[in-house]
Amino acid sequence: MRCLTTPMLLRALAQAARAGPPCGRSLHSSAVAATYKYVNMQEPEMDMKSVTDRAARTLLLTELFRGLGMTLSYLFREPATINYPFEKGPLSPRFRGEHALRRYPSGEERCIACKLCEAICPAQAITIEAEPRADGSRRTTRYDIDMTKCIYCGFCQEACPVDAIVEGPNFEFSTETHEELLYNKEKLLNNGDKWEAEIAANIQADYLYR
């Protein structure tokens, strides 16, 4: 590397200042870049075998056919996807899907009209009306959920002291009209009757963490 004396360096700096920085880079940065040492930079081998191999890969498209071969090999492997809706993957016991109201084995409704679910719902999607029973307890006369407001946070299920309102395993409940997503008490109880066995098993599997 050529050694620059002080007068030569000053002259070079003056010429660079008059001509402006080359390609937008200062003389100092160019001088620093010239001292960079590239680590692990490999020069291509120029012997006959290496040159022949590179020419063969280029002319015969060996890399292309190797990639195509790898793609074709996946036709004979087990697929990583499933054929939905004919096949469905497993669901977690904590999955939060369509809502349901549960009953006791005797058929009596679990809900005690405490309205904790209505109070805790951040989306204000639950509306409850209740009346007293002859024995002094309370029963719901109206239990509505606006499913278009629900954010499926699961707070209603966590707040319920008797596991009455739950989010079931069903996630396929799309509708053609808005009105069909306004669930009333009868709809929620029917959901609970339909999925009671699965809901009870999921709650039992998760009881240690509740």
Swiss-Prot record:
Cofactor note text: Binds 2 [4Fe-4S] cluster.
Transit peptide location: 1-34
Keywords per UniProt: 4Fe-4S, Electron transport, Iron, Iron-sulfur, Membrane, Metal-binding, Mitochondrion, Mitochondrion inner membrane, NAD, Oxidoreductase, Repeat, Respiratory chain, Transit peptide, Translocase, Transport, Ubiquinone
Topology relative to the membrane: Peripheral membrane protein
GO cellular component, one term: mitochondrion
Cofactor: [4Fe-4S] cluster
GO molecular function, one term: NADH dehydrogenase (ubiquinone) activity
Positions contributing to [4Fe-4S] cluster 2 binding: C121, C150, C153, C156
Subcellular location: Mitochondrion inner membrane
GO biological process: mitochondrial electron transport, NADH to ubiquinone; mitochondrial respiratory chain complex I assembly
Domain of life assignment: Eukaryota
Any coiled-coil regions, as ranges: none
Disulfide pairings: none
Record EC number: 7.1.1.2
Primary role: Core subunit of the mitochondrial membrane respiratory chain NADH dehydrogenase (Complex I) which catalyzes electron transfer from NADH through the respiratory chain, using ubiquinone as an electron acceptor. Essential for the catalytic activity and assembly of complex I.
Family: Belongs to the complex I 23 kDa subunit family.
HAMAP family: NDH1_NuoI (MF_01351)
Subunit details: Core subunit of respiratory chain NADH dehydrogenase (Complex I) which is composed of 45 different subunits. This is a component of the iron-sulfur (IP) fragment of the enzyme. Interacts with RAB5IF.
Protein name: NADH dehydrogenase [ubiquinone] iron-sulfur protein 8, mitochondrial
Organism: Pongo abelii (Sumatran orangutan)
Higher taxonomy: Eukaryota, Metazoa, Chordata, Craniata, Vertebrata
Gene name of the record: NDUFS8
